[in-house]
Structure formats: C-alpha cells, structure tokens
C-alpha cells in the first residue's frame, strides 16, 4: 500500500491558503481517480483506491498543520506501513511557484508539518526516509512576512499555473506508485513548460538564443580595429631607405 498525505489546515477559512497546497493536490488526485468517499478516521479525512495495481490511501490530517504527524503515524501503524510506503505533499517557500521536487529523507526545512511527521517517524524502521514532495509557492522576500504569506490565499494570477500543476500531479500519480520519482518530476516539468524557461518564469525564445548579440569589446580593442594601417611605399628612394633601416631583404 502507498499512503499519500497532503498537508494543510482544516476548515473553509484555510481552503485556498498557500499552506494548503498539499490538501489541494490530494483533492485533485481524488477527483481524477476512483476512490472511496472521504471518511473520518485517524484524526484525518481518508479515501482509498487503486492506482496502477497499487492500493493507495489518501490522507488529509485534520489536526492542523503542526500536529500532522499524529494522524499520519496512527494510519501507518494501523496498516503496518513503513516510511518507504509514505509520500507527503506540502508547500515549499524556497521553490519558485509551480516548481516540484521529490526527495527521500532530508530535513524539515523549517516546515512545522514535516517537523511533526519526522518526530513520529522515529518509532518506525527506516525513520525519516519517506518521500517528500515539495510544491513551490515562492517566498515573500522577508522572514517576518512568511507567516501571513503562507496563511494567505493564492492570488487570481496564480490560478493558471496552480491548476496546471495540480492536474499534472494527479494525472501522473501512477509513477509515484511505481516509485518512478525522476520520471514523475520530468513529466511535471514538461507540463509546466519548464523546458525553455529562465528564472522568474520568463520563457526564452530559442530563435533569440541562436541570434545572440556579439560580446561587447573594450574601447581599446575597438580603437585598434578602427586604426588605419600606415601607408608604406613599396618602391622609390623612401622604400630603399626603409629596407635598410628594417633589414628587409628583396
């Protein structure tokens, strides 16, 4: 069995928060695949289904973000799962909006939901070696702005990339069931149009790259290139005198 946990805070007031992007991903997986109805168990909303022959349990902890580990640990103990059977989906400040990364193990990066899960995973064989799917939401630019930023709603301008990302995650979730994490990340990057992007989401026209302007030259080099060559006579008395001075032979 694969347990996919999306992190967030319960309640309609938090539904569209950046901090709830994990819940959003779980909801989209639920909508695009055949799952049982949501039910309340393990201090969470859960739904079970089968993806690519693998039984999958979706979990949305209802404990609030900072206690997410209580719910996930309870579900894992009930089904006798190990950290290798767990994928956690959550928001990442240090990735630009729309970027996705998956890694097995690692630190919490200051994320309180991950801190809670890490603490509860210590009692399982394999400890903190579960898969972490980080979904980029961007950073507000200053530490003191982070709290209000993550608990703020996504802007309308974010809807296009957010809908594309959620759809791509849900459509390719079978790769997670097959443990094909690198292929999954590549598929998401293609869906998000990352192939020809500069930082900041500005797409690069390949034609512009082919016609890149020449490197700038220093003013000294330009002066040398523009300097006229001296007009040296090839015959006559002056030419003969120059040959003697320069030691030039006929």
From Swiss-Prot:
Its main location: cytoplasm. Residues 192-250 are annotated as: Disordered. Its EC number is 3.1.1.29. Residues 219-229 have a biased composition (Polar residues). It catalyses: an N-acyl-L-alpha-aminoacyl-tRNA + H2O = an N-acyl-L-amino acid + a tRNA + H(+). The record marks 91 as: Stabilizes the basic form of H active site to accept a proton. GO terms for biological process: protein quality control for misfolded or incompletely synthesized proteins; rescue of stalled ribosome. GO terms for molecular function: peptidyl-tRNA hydrolase activity; tRNA binding. Residues 241-250 have a biased composition (Basic and acidic residues). One of its GO terms (cellular component) is cytoplasm. The record marks 9 as: Discriminates between blocked and unblocked aminoacyl-tRNA. The active site is at 19 (proton acceptor). The keyword Cytoplasm applies. Pfam families: Pept_tRNA_hydro (PF01195). It is an enzyme of class 3 (hydrolase). The keyword Ligase does not apply. It is found in: Cytoplasm. InterPro entries: Pept_tRNA_hydro, Pept_tRNA_hydro_CS, Pept_tRNA_hydro_sf. Hydrolyzes ribosome-free peptidyl-tRNAs (with 1 or more amino acids incorporated), which drop off the ribosome during protein synthesis, or as a result of ribosome stalling. Monomer. Belongs to the PTH family. This is Peptidyl-tRNA hydrolase. It comes from Brucella canis (strain ATCC 23365 / NCTC 10854 / RM-666). The lineage of its organism: Bacteria, Pseudomonadati, Pseudomonadota, Alphaproteobacteria, Hyphomicrobiales. The gene is pth.
């Amino acid at each position: 069995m694969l347990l996919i946990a999306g992190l967030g805070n319960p309640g309609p007031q938090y539904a569209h928060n950046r901090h709830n992007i994990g819940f959003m991903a779980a909801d989209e997986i639920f909508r695009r695949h055949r799952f049982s109805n949501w039910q309340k168990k393990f201090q969470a909303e859960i739904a079970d289904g089968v993806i690519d022959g693998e039984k999958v349990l979706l979990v949305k902890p209802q404990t609030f973000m900072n206690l997410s580990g209580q719910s996930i640990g309870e579900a894992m103990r009930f089904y006798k799962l190990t950290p290798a059977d767990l994928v956690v989906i959550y928001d990442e400040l240090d990735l630009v909006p729309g970027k996705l990364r998956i890694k097995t193990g690692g630190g919490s990066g200051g994320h309180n939901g991950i801190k809670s899960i890490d603490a509860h995973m210590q009692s399982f064989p394999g400890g903190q070696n579960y898969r972490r799917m980080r979904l980029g939401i961007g950073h507000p630019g200053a530490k003191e702005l982070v709290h209000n930023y993550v608990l703020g709603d996504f802007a309308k301008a974010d809807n296009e990339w957010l809908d594309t990302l959620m759809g791509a995650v849900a459509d390719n979730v079978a790769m997670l069931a097959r443990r094909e994490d690198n292929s999954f990340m590549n598929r998401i990057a293609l869906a998000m149009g990352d192939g020809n992007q500069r930082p900041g989401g500005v797409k690069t026209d390949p034609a512009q790259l082919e016609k890149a302007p020449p490197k700038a030259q220093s003013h000294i080099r330009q002066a040398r290139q523009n300097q006229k060559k001296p007009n040296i006579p090839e015959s006559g008395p002056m030419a003969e005198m120059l040959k003697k001075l320069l030691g030039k032979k006929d």
